[in-house]
Amino acid sequence: MSSDIQQIRIGLTNNHPCSYLADRMERVAVAIDPQMQTPETYEVLMANGFRRSGDTIYKPHCDHCQSCQALRIPAPDFVPSKSQKRLLKLLSQEFHWQLKPELDEDWYTLYARYIFARHRHGSMYPPNKMEFAKFARAKWLNTQYLHLYQGEKLVAIAVTDLLPNSASAFYTFYDPDISISLGTLAVLCQLNYCQQTKKQWLYLGYQIDECPAMNYKVRFNPHQRLVNQRWRG
């Protein structure tokens, strides 16, 4: 643990089937001290591998698996790949984004279409407004919604936590009928925001190499992974 937080009280959940790897069991450590729930402390906790779901701050604590690795991008040093440069060009020509404190009125239609098309067998199914609000918001955190538009059409929303020196890509949903990589485009917008506001890091959550749906994260370079409590990369 960073020297900024010497001790933290945690509680452990029971083992249950992993949401990402079918043959694994998962367990998480949950921070149970309310004083941990501040933007400044949460930023330190993220640098030590923690993440949030709603107001709950947690970290994987599995008995026989270390596949989850926190991943972050040093925003000032980011160098787009050829395919990312093409997306950035498309962004300047056809798309625009805006960070908002609240969701657009038509957000749920987009969210429901995304869940039905991409996550029918996941924990977010069936889509539910109240459950999404509990999942996406933390009362102690500045959470903003990055809205991505193609012309006037809303095509993606990236829930983004803003911390003193970093941002966290919390959850993204998008139009499942658009063929370009809207998830990658949303991350490029978040990186753009970090660079504009001089934030050092964009956290992308956990990377699991065995999970193909997550492998878009490692295409952002340079990036760092938290391995054995050290950031490497």
Curated annotation (Swiss-Prot):
It comes from the Bacteria. Signal peptide: none annotated. Keywords: Acyltransferase, Cytoplasm, Transferase. One of its GO terms (biological process) is ubiquitin-dependent protein catabolic process via the N-end rule pathway. It catalyses: N-terminal L-glutamyl-[protein] + L-leucyl-tRNA(Leu) = N-terminal L-leucyl-L-glutamyl-[protein] + tRNA(Leu) + H(+); N-terminal L-aspartyl-[protein] + L-leucyl-tRNA(Leu) = N-terminal L-leucyl-L-aspartyl-[protein] + tRNA(Leu) + H(+). Its main location: cytoplasm. It is found in: Cytoplasm. Its EC number is 2.3.2.29. Pfam families: ATE_C, ATE_N. GO terms for molecular function: arginyl-tRNA--protein transferase activity; leucyl-tRNA--protein transferase activity. It is an enzyme of class 2 (transferase). GO terms for cellular component: cytoplasm. Belongs to the R-transferase family. Bpt subfamily. HAMAP family: Bpt. NCBIfam families: PRK01305.1-3, PRK01305.2-2, PRK01305.2-3. Functions in the N-end rule pathway of protein degradation where it conjugates Leu from its aminoacyl-tRNA to the N-termini of proteins containing an N-terminal aspartate or glutamate. This is Aspartate/glutamate leucyltransferase.
